[in-house]
Amino acid sequence: MRAVVLVGGFGTRLRPLTATIPKPMLPVGHVPIIERLVTNLGRSGVTDVTLALGFKPEPFVEAFPDGECAGVTLCYAVEPEPLDTAGAIRFAAEFAGIDDTFVVANGDILTDLDVSELVRFHRERGAQATIHLVGVPDPSAFGVVALDAQGRVERFVEKPAPGTAPSNLINAGTYVLEASALQLIPTGQKVSIERATFPLIAAEGGLFALATDDYWIDTGRPELYLQANLDVLGDTRRHDRCVAVHPDAVVDPSAVVEHSIIGARAQVGAAVIRNSVLLHGAVVEAGAVVTDSVVMGRVGANAVVHDSVLGADGVVAPGEHLSGVRRPSPDAATGT
């Protein structure tokens, strides 16, 4: 089985973290998001993945120079200009010569889904396209999918008012497509698979969806990226767990580190770190307290950082108190 993974976005929702690294290359539990995603696809029987690349493709090629990740063969398809989701899928699939049933995955989604079950369901229904769905407590912020008894998609409802949604099932960002679906996507144009292609297929009765209760998270917002990291510390994930402190990190013996991840080459003085992620090279000086935050930059001595995101150039002065802040500001950062 072959797959296309969409990794060409700008990562604007995760700025300033994505000012220096593409979103799918950010680590979750010391391992890049894209590597965790490809590993799960490989567990499900996917043997070849084409990365649909856009802005700044170089970090992906440099990370996997031999064209292999977790035993899965990689192909790099760099779109000449932003083509949105459907446009990128067609470009990448044709670049890779895909001419049979294939899988598509959004590059910022982490899930324990067994994709082979989605493929089996797709083939049993004779579908042209199949969407993986997950249930959420409040679907009003999402596009909701209404199904018939066989799993055929009847309609989409975008961001329904509270209490009016036909279901609590939302698009979870993994699909199975027939190669024939590519012909519904205009070449060389910006086309959304969610807003343009799927409604076309649904109108002909060829769009199906399967809901599962597998672990699933969209890592595209800071609070969810933080949660994805903390999830691999416990028993939330079926397969993926990690050690809290990377062996290449330097942590003062008197530091208090609770339910947090300390990345490679991070330095922590006699500080307190709770429910937080310190990424590669982050520095937290003695006396500082960091809670519910993601840190790439430097936190000065005796500073307090809560519910904040510090990019690579983010600096908190000694003694400064920070809460609910992104530094540098997202507007000042150039996303990838």
Regions of interest found by a model, annotated:
Residues 25, 144-147, 198, 209:
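A structural signal for short hydrophobic beta-strand segments in well-ordered beta-sheet cores
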Residues 2-5, 26-106, 110, 115-117, ...:
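Conserved N-terminal catalytic core of the sugar/cofactor nucleotidyltransferase
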Residues 14, 60-64, 228:
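Hydrophobic packing residues within well-ordered alpha-helices of enzyme cores
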Residues 101-103, 110, 116-123, 136-139, ...:
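Catalytic-core segments of class I nucleotidyltransferases/pyrophosphorylases
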Residues 125-135:
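A short, conserved acidic/glycine-rich loop-to-beta-strand motif
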Residues 239-336:
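Structural signal for interior beta-strand "rungs" in well-ordered beta-sheet cores
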Residues 1-19:
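N-terminal nucleotide-binding beta1-loop-alpha1 segment
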